[in-house]
Amino acid sequence: MSSTAVVHGDDLMEPTLQSILSQKTLRWIFVGGKGGVGKTTTSCSLAIQLAKVRKSVLLISTDPAHNLSDAFGQKFGKEARLVDGYSNLSAMEIDPNGSIQDLLASGDSQGDDPLAGLGMGNMMQDLAFSIPGVDEAMSFAEVLKQVKSLSYEVIVFDTAPTGHTLRFLQFPTVLEKALAKLSQLSSQFGPMLNSILGARGGLPGGQNIDELLQKMESLRETISEVNTQFKNPDMTTFVCVCIAEFLSLYETERMIQELTSYGIDTHAIVVNQLLFPKEGSGCEQCNARRKMQKKYLEQIEELYEDFNVVRMPLLVEEVRGKEKLEKFSEMLVHPYVPPQ
């Protein structure tokens, strides 16, 4: 699947992300890594390159820090919006902890809780929240539903730092647990709850318990279907971003092992913030740091010899704004050549 470049007579993996751009069957691309390693810059740059070869690209940030707006210098929200200067690249920032009530409501904006005053409070919400991760799972499912209906050719996820990155793989199970709990409640108290809710004007959007269950079931189906796609290497790949330091390398190895255990394809690593001091440079710190980075780079190349390892330099300025991102993105496909 990945193209190769011949160097000194040996077959080595090409040190670029060209294989991802060339793989036209890809629909989902995840970009993940430890905090502060340049994930957002990498995902924005990859999306810019994809926009050159694909009809429509959507870049989604699921990181609560939401750095896409800062990177492009343009405000994004929970609705997909075209990135200034592009006709086929859109971006959106979603809150992975969106309210479950918002998700279950069918657009009804009534602020009154129909169960308030009955001593039940936010019973449905409390019930759902009692299952760890259900809120995030439903939020993610809702986004996937929206994304599917928008029919973008390829979707790039700028994910939250490593700990949260792979949570989406557990979401179908989480939603099944929530459904089982709500189904049990419905079979025991359904008629009574529906009559109480009916008297109080129903749930938001005029739904009853059964409709609420159907809504959750459809979200679960969506997320299960997409999860199947996530495990198909023709449709999904994961780009790991790191820096040449021990902790980042350790996190990357842990993440790759976890991705492999879930059956998710990963064959590309972007190593950011590399120093290339000029020969004879008198900068002690630069030379010492470069020596350390070389050691970890060698380990990365040894561990991941069948990966596309992309080496990106540490730049003197922040990579912010369309022009700088475009310049940076070129180095993902044309390897950086350090000045002598």
UniProtKB/Swiss-Prot annotation:
Keywords: ATP-binding, Cytoplasm, Endoplasmic reticulum, Hydrolase, Metal-binding, Nucleotide-binding, Transport, Zinc. Zn(2+) binds at residues 283, 286. GO terms for cellular component: GET complex. Pfam families: ArsA_ATPase (PF02374). Belongs to the arsA ATPase family. ATPase required for the post-translational delivery of tail-anchored (TA) proteins to the endoplasmic reticulum. Recognizes and selectively binds the transmembrane domain of TA proteins in the cytosol. This complex then targets to the endoplasmic reticulum by membrane-bound receptors, where the tail-anchored protein is released for insertion. This process is regulated by ATP binding and hydrolysis. ATP binding drives the homodimer towards the closed dimer state, facilitating recognition of newly synthesized TA membrane proteins. ATP hydrolysis is required for insertion. This is ATPase get3.
